[in-house]
């Protein structure tokens, strides 16, 4: 709970001053939290992005009820899981937009974000039983990462009440991937 609070405060600060100006030291000063206390959780500013992603995944996992997916298609399960992730991240949307914008010339930041999202996509593919020992299984995580990335950018600018633009984009991309997989599976 302490870490979650620090992540929230960190993301609020990122929203206020941007990624470039953000640092663990600045968080310590502004929030009057001893630096050595913050360093228990975050070794550097990049750590907060890593811990954030893991926190989001943990929150999703705690809300999952596998039995709700028993009669759902793989596509529907992936859709629900990704929408759960967007819902979990909603309060951090503007901070995430600033981080994404700053990442364009920050290879280390891109690497951390990519690694975490790839791990999440692997987790989602496992939950949806999408791996089936097919020769193309190794591509699934990359395709899902691509789908997530495009949908993420749509989500960042989606101000509709029910995230209808995000849902439409995600459904369109997952349907295209499903059609592609069916064609490839027929080889």
Predicted regions mapped to residue ranges:
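Solvent-exposed, amphipathic alpha-helical segments
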Residues: 9-16, 59-63, 99, 147-158
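Amphipathic alpha-helical packing segments from all-alpha helical-bundle domains
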Residues: 107-130, 138-149
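Amphipathic alpha-helical segments used for helix-helix packing
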Residues: 88-108, 121-125
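Short, basic, alpha-helical segments at the C-terminal edge of helix-turn-helix-like DNA-binding modules
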Residues: 53-61, 68, 107
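Hydrophobic/aromatic-rich alpha-helical bundle segments in the mid-to-C-terminal region
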Residues: 130-176, 180-187
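Helix-turn-helix
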Residues: 5, 13-51
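N-terminal positioning helix adjacent to the helix-turn-helix/winged-helix DNA-binding module
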Residues: 1-9
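Hydrophobic alpha-helical connector segments
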Residues: 51, 65-98
């Amino acid at each position: 709970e302490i870490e979650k609070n620090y992540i929230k405060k960190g993301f609020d600060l990122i929203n206020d001053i941007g990624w470039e100006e953000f640092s663990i030291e600045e968080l310590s000063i502004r929030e009057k939290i001893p630096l050595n206390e913050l360093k228990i959780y975050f070794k550097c500013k990049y750590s907060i992005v890593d811990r954030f992603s893991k926190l989001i995944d943990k929150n999703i996992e705690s809300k999952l009820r596998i039995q709700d997916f028993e009669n759902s298609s793989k596509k529907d399960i992936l859709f629900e899981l990704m929408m759960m992730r967007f819902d979990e991240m909603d309060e951090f949307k503007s901070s995430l937009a600033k981080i994404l914008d700053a990442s364009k010339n920050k290879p280390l930041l891109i690497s951390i974000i990519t690694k975490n999202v790839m791990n999440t996509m692997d987790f989602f593919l496992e939950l949806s039983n999408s791996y089936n020992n097919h020769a193309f299984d190794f591509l699934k995580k990359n395709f899902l990462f691509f789908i997530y990335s495009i949908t993420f950018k749509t989500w960042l600018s989606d101000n509709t009440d029910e995230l209808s633009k995000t849902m439409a984009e995600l459904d369109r991309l997952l349907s295209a991937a499903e059609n592609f997989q069916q064609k490839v599976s027929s080889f």
